[in-house]
């Protein structure tokens, strides 16, 4: 390779949407015929006006619609080349994370339990010292530690969205 040559690699497609349509009822479609490829090591934003189906599409990607009877998803969604319907939903949800515009805490869980929810859902055991470190570091990193450090046992709904 010469100093002036450029080495390029083709990025790997990690998520593929193939003609995806989502229906809330047989008469009402929320998303119609969406096809896209999402590549490894890239950040992708789904943008559009309110009510156009952004959140609906994201929920289909991580199989949240299966929790609600009557919602139908057509087309194919492939995660790392495999149909998401052939994978355990929890595996899909671990692989396809989402950040919504207005995330909400679990209202019946304490602030501390909300912070630790990812560890618990993934079966990761931590010592009391590790838990304290995770809570402190996580809440400091988002600027909430000083506000909640004395109320970690209070419900997550205590936190304001504003």
Please tell me what each predicted stretch does:
Residues 70-72, 83-97, 121, 128-129:
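ABC ATPase NBD coupling module
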Residues 9-14, 22-33, 65-70, 86-88:
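A short, flexible loop at the N-terminus of ABC-type nucleotide-binding domains that lies
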Residues 153-162:
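Conserved ABC ATPase signature
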Residues 58, 108-118:
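Short coil-to-helix segment of the ABC ATPase nucleotide-binding domain corresponding to the Q-loop/switch region
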Residues 47-49:
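The feature captures the beta-strand-to-loop junction immediately N-terminal to the Walker
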Residues 76-83, 120, 128-150:
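Conserved ABC ATPase "signature" region
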Residues 45, 59, 76-77, 90-104, ...:
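ABC nucleotide-binding domain signature
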Residues 17-20, 29-42, 75:
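Conserved beta-strand
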């Amino acid at each position: 390779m010469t100093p002036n040559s450029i080495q390029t690699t083709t990025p790997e497609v990690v998520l593929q949407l193939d003609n995806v349509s989502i229906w809330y009822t047989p008469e009402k479609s929320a998303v119609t015929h969406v096809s896209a490829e999402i590549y490894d090591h890239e950040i992708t934003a789904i943008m559009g006006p309110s009510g156009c189906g952004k959140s609906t599409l994201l929920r289909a990607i991580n199989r949240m619609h299966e929790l609600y009877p009557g919602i139908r998803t057509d087309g194919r969604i492939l995660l790392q080349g495999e149909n998401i319907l052939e994978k355990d939903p929890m595996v899909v949800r671990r692989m396809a994370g989402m950040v919504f515009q207005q995330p909400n805490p679990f209202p019946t869980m304490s602030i501390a339990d909300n912070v630790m929810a990812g560890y618990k859902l993934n079966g990761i055991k931590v010592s009391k010292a590790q838990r304290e470190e995770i809570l402190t570091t996580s809440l400091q990193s988002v600027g909430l530690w000083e506000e909640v450090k004395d109320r970690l046992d209070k419900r997550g709904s205590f936190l304001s969205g504003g």
